[in-house]
Amino acid sequence: MVEPARKKQRIDRDTHHTVAEPVTEAKNTLYVSQLNEKINMQRLRVNLFLLFATFGEVLKVSMNFKKQRGQAFITMRTIDQASLAQISLNGERFFGKPLKVEFSKSETKTL
């Protein structure tokens, strides 16, 4: 289970006071990079869907090869499913290249 976001402490360089800054909260969207760019985009999208569906319900696979070659965003139904997929697939080989799977830093728009 993912814990709720907490505040992380840091020291302000100018005032030397402790400042609370938010810790990034895990989301149900994963950022996948290091995808093999030689594979057809439709084939890659279908295979990413099937791979991530092993860990739960995939709501969306977003890819934009014009702007972000070799990258995709995978939206899972729950944070727990996304977490399981991230832990299980990070570093695994996919079409000959090791996947880099991280939680997306931007908000997901799909519900």
Swiss-Prot record:
A Pfam family it matches: RRM_5
Ranges in a coiled coil: none
GO CC list: nucleus; Prp19 complex; spliceosomal complex; U2 snRNP; U2-type prespliceosome
GO molecular function: U2 snRNA binding
Position of the signal peptide: none
Entry's Gene Ontology BP terms: mRNA splicing, via spliceosome; U2-type prespliceosome assembly
The keyword ATP-binding belongs to this UniProt entry's keyword annotation: no
Quaternary structure (record): Belongs to the CWC complex (or CEF1-associated complex), a spliceosome sub-complex reminiscent of a late-stage spliceosome composed of the U2, U5 and U6 snRNAs and at least BUD13, BUD31, BRR2, CDC40, CEF1, CLF1, CUS1, CWC2, CWC15, CWC21, CWC22, CWC23, CWC24, CWC25, CWC27, ECM2, HSH155, IST3, ISY1, LEA1, MSL1, NTC20, PRP8, PRP9, PRP11, PRP19, PRP21, PRP22, PRP45, PRP46, SLU7, SMB1, SMD1, SMD2, SMD3, SMX2, SMX3, SNT309, SNU114, SPP2, SYF1, SYF2, RSE1 and YJU2. Interacts with RDS3. Interacts with LEA1.
Protein name: U2 small nuclear ribonucleoprotein B''
UniProt organism field: Saccharomyces cerevisiae (strain ATCC 204508 / S288c)
Lineage: Eukaryota, Fungi, Dikarya, Ascomycota, Saccharomycotina
